[in-house]
Amino acid sequence: MSISKNFDEILDQLKAIVGPKNYIDDVLKMDPYLSDWRNQFHGASPLILKPLNTQMVSEILALCNENHIKVVPQGGNTGLVGGSVPDDSGLEVVVCLEKMNKILDIDPVNHTMTVEAGCILSEVQNTALKAKRIFPLSLAAEGSCQIGGNLSTNAGGTSVLHYGNAKELVLGLEAVMADGSIMNSLRRLRKDNTGYDLKQLFLGSEGTLGIITKAVIKLFPIPTNKVTSIVAISNLESTIELLVKLRERSGDSISAFEYMDRACIDVLIDQMGIKDIFDQKYEHYALVEFSSSRHNDNLQLLLEDSIASEVLNKNVDDAIVASNETQVSHFWNLRETLPGVLKNIGEYVTFDISVPISLLPELIINAKKVCNRICKNSRVFVFGHIGDGNIHYYLFKPQEISIDEFLNLKSKIKSSIYDITAKLDGSFSAEHGIGVAKKQELKYYTSEVEIELMKVIKKSLDPNNIMNP
């Protein structure tokens, strides 16, 4: 449906809603809002709006809905699939929530915090710590990503094994619908069996059904015991076996199990100028963390004994248990720095895929075979959250082929990897979402019934299709 009024007139009305200091219409100042942090997705917009409160968001959406103006919600713009970047039509308005950044309430007794959507994740974490609690969502981009974006993409991260995805950390939600109406469900209740759990519609829907403006999130006791180790392993099957044994031995104390292959370690050594972790090179590495808020747990001894047992079982070749905070920080820095290092070393295609944990070795091995067949001599890097079945897979352009040749191969590489993933009952998007990058995969790998249900929900909540279309 076409825009019903003079476009410039509508833009002026939108500016009036937020006030003169809360919008950008100068093209020269818009660039940070029109491309993603990896510089892979680019768009255009006539106006960047920065509302100060929910009422402003409501008025913006009501006006846009009435006049069929497309809206792209944006948080920290740290996504990896282009979901917060407008298209190149120059007709989509960006609604950036960065100024809605207040911590509204913290209740240590109830273990909850109420926040606005524009709060930076690291600030939420730090505020929780001041109240002697933690908010466990942890991402490499936590210094710039915003809680609203985390929830609308159902972010994962390094603590999913113990605490779950973002949507499992939410009790209540406020969201503005496409027509400007406000759904206020900011309940701080762990038990509330009064009809449909409507907040789930907005968690993971990437701003396509409305804009999350506030949330009640869960807090947890600060772990009083924490121990971290880097473990070297010769084969993938032993990596999975190690995870199984550690979970059996530690119960609920294992809080992270991150994976990096040898290629990842090599590129970190090369790019960061650091020493190798062990005297000998190994094919696979696991970053393991145990944590507990129970004061009488001796996690150091538990982890050391568990690893020693797996050395005897030939599932572990070597290990270092961190003896101080400096070592802990170094180990985690390796894993968290890796994506940023990889994005700077050449042209690549990347995957965010998941399968049942027991099938991870089959996925990784078969994916490497396919990549080598399609694109010989390519550099492949595999890392991720093996503890929850999520792998990140980077394949780089070989030196002997041109960028154009590599770009022509990308589609075949993607479809081959996604086909393998689908055959293993996996997902082509484990934690990064759909965005712009994976629209075609959504149509191809999702059943007709599921697609039709999504369309029914979208049509019901956003009949004019203005929300992040």
Residue ranges and their predicted role:
Residues 102-258:
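FAD-binding subdomain of flavoenzyme oxidoreductases
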Residues 1-37, 66-69, 310-326, 423-428, ...:
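N-terminal accessory segments
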Residues 181, 438-469:
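Activity-critical C-terminal alpha-helical subdomain
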Residues 24-31, 230-233, 238-412, 416, ...:
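C-terminal substrate-recognition/cap domain of FAD-linked oxidoreductases
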Residues 108-111, 401-402, 437-443:
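Short beta-alpha connecting loops at secondary-structure transitions
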Residues 1-62, 79-111, 264-275, 325-352, ...:
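N-terminal flexible segment immediately upstream of the FAD-binding catalytic core
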Residues 28, 75-77, 140, 262, ...:
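Short, ordered loop/turn segments at secondary-structure junctions
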